[in-house]
């Protein structure tokens, strides 16, 4: 499901114009990004948390030059689903949908 699909579904269920839903959704995404950039996690009760995960410093490798590269400690954004969200997914009877990659050159 893509963002456009979500907007369409919400519009159908609520009667709110798609444009208004898109603005609200984009504003939500922007606020989540801003909060994480400022180091503040976002908690949505019953859904999950948008958090920062710390990645330790490590030595990587530039394979083109065959040189060791130091990767400093850093944070990455992550999503931690709420317990009830995880439980609902576990109990669902849906089969795992495999996404097939399409080669654009073939079409």
Language model: regions and residue ranges:
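Strongly charged
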Residues: 1-107
